[in-house]
C-alpha cells in the first residue's frame, strides 16, 4: 500500500504512482489517495470531527495514549504532534485541527512528520491496524 496525502502537491505524486503501477505492471500495489479536507469516512466519528485530518490525528492520539502506538524519540515529530491546536467549529460543534495557515502565522512549519504518521495509521477500508499488533 502507498497511502498518499493527495492534497495539493500530493495529487501529482498519486498520479505518477498510478501511471508507474500500470507501466510496470505492479498489480499488487494499491495507491490510496487521502485528501486531508475530505469528510470523515467513519459515520460515528463524523459526528465529532470536522474533517478526515482531524479524525486521523485523533486516532493517532488515542492509539498513543492507550499504548497501542509507540512513537520514536524524535524531537521534531513530538514537537509537531504537541504544538498543533484544536478548535471547535460549525453547528453542531465538531473538533477541528488548527489550519496549516494558522500554524504558519504562529511561526511554525507544516507538520509533515506528524501527517506521515497519521497517514501510516489510516485504515480507510484497507486493513485493521489492530490486527498488526
Language-model region placement:
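Acidic two-metal-ion nuclease catalytic site recognized across multiple nuclease folds
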Residues: 78, 82-133
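Mg2+-dependent endonuclease catalytic cores in nucleic-acid-processing enzymes, primarily RNase H-like
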Residues: 1-93
Amino acid at each position: 500500500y502507498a497511502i498518499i496525502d493527495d492534497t495539493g502537491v500530493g495529487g501529482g505524486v498519486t498520479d505518477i504512482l498510478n501511471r508507474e503501477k500500470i507501466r510496470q505492471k505492479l498489480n499488487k500495489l494499491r495507491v490510496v489517495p487521502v485528501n486531508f479536507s475530505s469528510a470523515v469516512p467513519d459515520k460515528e466519528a463524523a459526528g465529532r470531527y470536522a474533517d478526515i485530518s482531524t479524525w486521523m490525528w485523533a486516532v493517532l492520539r488515542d492509539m498513543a495514549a492507550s499504548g497501542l502506538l509507540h512513537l520514536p524519540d524524535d524531537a521534531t515529530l513530538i514537537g509537531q504532534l504537541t504544538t498543533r491546536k484544536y478548535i471547535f467549529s460549525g453547528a453542531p460543534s465538531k473538533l477541528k485541527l488548527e489550519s496549516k495557515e494558522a500554524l504558519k502565522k504562529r511561526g511554525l512549519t507544516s507538520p509533515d512528520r506528524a501527517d506521515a504518521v497519521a497517514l501510516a495509521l489510516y485504515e480507510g477500508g484497507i486493513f485493521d491496524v489492530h490486527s498488526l499488533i
